[in-house]
């Protein structure tokens, strides 16, 4: 069963939150962070992407960069741009899609998801109560571990899902009917972000006790952050001769959402060539395993599982997997990412390793089908393949079976904003 606790968050004053908050470190590169921070000295990018304070081209792994993060984190607190709450509490973080002309997702405009910001147990990560569905890379783990170690804090939360729970739904609905502590629309994604404080002892007790009845939590997004936080916590426990188990380093910050509320977008593929085939030869080869239907020049989106959308030569096609070619009892093999990788990318195009092959690139669904069309029409890519989104049920089934999702399979949106709450490991 899941162990969570309240904590004394470090966060910006209400009037500074829009200057401090940022996108998460791993969705943009150094130059994008430099551009977004601009001349805003209060931007969290100075802590989570501190290479922006050095000349262009400075490696994010330079030891001076880690030192700068520590210096800036301390300075933000000294200047009052970040302040620690006086008492332990939980937080409720709401994200609403399509609150502005700047943002919005097809079919999801106005949808809100409500997450509980908690301190999750390192022990739960180690013993499998917190379930994973992705492999992590050691180099990325090491980078995040350094940030956690040197700052002695979880600067950014991890994104968890949990099976829907009526008690938590009711508590969240009641508290979010009041005025939030933060309420703003992010300039980049155009989504609305709100935060409430959960201070009442009864409510805190209800959250803690209800999570203790939930058998598993699922990492939706942030596998490297989860691994780094848990490994640093375990390190600190080992190094402390008086370790008790209730120290703050035994926990790491997560935002937990009911599984049914989450939005998973398509994660699409663009490929540079047809492996020596002409357009006609490629379409003929596809017809062996798919019913191929020409749809025309207007962008066409797959309508169901096992249907794919192909853009080739200025034309969109529907590719429907023929009956009997998917084993629905196989949680991995029946995924559309697995089917497309095996029957199209590997067998026809000769792309064996999605992580390393330079002939393929990936486009998150937030960019829309227009981005696929653009990259083919400008000659950069030869074809694009759009997939139907993976469901949260599929992800949970794979995690429950102890399996790992294929690479580039999930794209959760909205992303959590960073800088709304920070968790210190020594309190």
Which positions does each model-derived feature cover?
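Surface-exposed, charge/polar-rich loops and edge strands
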Residues: 1-427
